Amino acid sequence: MVKIRLARYGTKKRPFYKLVVADSRFSRNGRFIERLGYFNPIAKGKSEILKLNLERIEHWTNQGAQMSERTKKLIKQKR
């Protein structure tokens, strides 16, 4: 099954997440099909906290991709 989910990057205690489309059998930070945006929960100054490609997200959901709960909340927040 294809899922839209967050992959964790960054360093210890300074997380940075990429929103990716990946097969559910792959590990969290493993192979992915496409990168759809990012989420930086500790952004400072003029840095963007959330950037999403809503057009591609719509494309993947129409193709049958399932979203994680956190991803659903972030997309709802962006719209």
Swiss-Prot record:
Disulfide bonds: none annotated. One of its GO terms (biological process) is translation. Pfam families: Ribosomal_S16. Keywords: Ribonucleoprotein, Ribosomal protein. InterPro entries: Ribosomal_bS16 (IPR000307), Ribosomal_bS16_dom_sf (IPR023803). One of its GO terms (cellular component) is small ribosomal subunit. GO terms for molecular function: structural constituent of ribosome. Gene3D superfamilies: 3.30.1320.10. HAMAP family: Ribosomal_bS16. NCBIfam families: S16 (TIGR00002). PANTHER family: 30S RIBOSOMAL PROTEIN S16, SMALL RIBOSOMAL SUBUNIT PROTEIN BS16M. Belongs to the bacterial ribosomal protein bS16 family. This is Small ribosomal subunit protein bS16. It comes from Buchnera aphidicola subsp. Acyrthosiphon pisum (strain APS). The gene is rpsP.
